[in-house]
Amino acid sequence: TPIAYFSLSNDNLSYEKFQQKTSFNRLNRAIDNAKRMKQYPAVKIGRLAIDESHRNTGVGRYLLSLIKSSMIINQKSGCRFITVDAYNDAIGFYEKNGFVMVNAFNPEKRTQPMFFDLAQLL
């Protein structure tokens, strides 16, 4: 029986996704001027699920670490960021693992867009 799974797809982190354009500009300043763009390649975590009997055991943290390492070592996707539309009750988990909210929390939405900058690991 599987204890966890995840799915990935190509995505982007773009200027349009940020309600506060100053947040995108702050992110942009961390990137070399010659390489700045209006959108950046990303890999989206479409699903990340852990069997209830294995929650709070480090399996989720391990899978995120595996995903992050894979993006840096393999470089098959050519991405700079990992994105996720986190369920509201999972935001804390992603924040503990270095993800940042794209916009301010919106209680009317079931999910919140978040991202992780892979440059932190280099």
Residues covered by each model-derived region:
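An acidic/histidine-cluster motif and surrounding catalytic segment
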Residues: T1, S7, R29-A34, R55, ...
